[in-house]
Amino acid sequence: MASKTELDNLFMNIAEQVAQMSKSRRSKVGAVVVKDGNIVSMGWNGTPPGFDNNCENEAPDGTLTTKACVIHAEANAILKLAAVSGGR
């Protein structure tokens, strides 16, 4: 049986991999929701469903700023969990 530390490290590694799903050019963030040692949801930072999945505005000088509509990875993971669990 894996120790709690080993499992925590595993879940962190998975979150880092999930982050690669983000379309953000500035900051890719991933999150996993774990219950009783099992992953029950995953999420990454990005725009809400129905929005163009472009996370940044680009200034003429090339500076990128995050759009206000971008949802944090942990919020996306919780929203996905709520959607599949019926909010329970």
Where are these regions (language model features)?
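Zinc-dependent deaminase catalytic domain
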Residues: 1-88
